[in-house]
Amino acid sequence: FKSLSADLNPEADPILVQIGGLIRTSTLMKINSQKRWKPLLERIRLSEDTLNIEIRAEGHTDDKPIPMNSNFRNNWELSSARALNLVQRLSELAEMDQHYFSALGYGEFRPKVDIKNIKDRSLLEEARAQNRRVEIYFDAFIRSKNESIENI
């Protein structure tokens, strides 16, 4: 991502097309129609649990403060917008309903590269560029049907 931008880099689109295809054709996304998984799914159903499948995008920014004239109030908003743009594109490419997708933003608080001790300006800018990213996670987990907000 460019600094202060949530727009997807057009150069990343071929990779996103591949990721969308992987999601669409993955065994996990077809689990309900495959005989070999019926015993597992029945066991989950009988235990009153559900199998949740989620494609999650986690957005990140560099450490630079957001200027007053920006479209975003802070790095949390910017990182969230990056993640949201990515999941919307992946949903489109995977040809899947958006309920499988989630997006969240961490702002500058989970950097890939710690920049505290980097003195060289070009190395610092390179590190900041690495921190401007969205990470994609493909999760499957079992959730109790009885689980509610009151129990958490």
Question: Each PLM stretch: what is its role?
Answer:
Residues 2-11, 15-18, 23, 29, ...:
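Periplasmic OmpA-like peptidoglycan-binding domain that tethers envelope proteins to the cell wall
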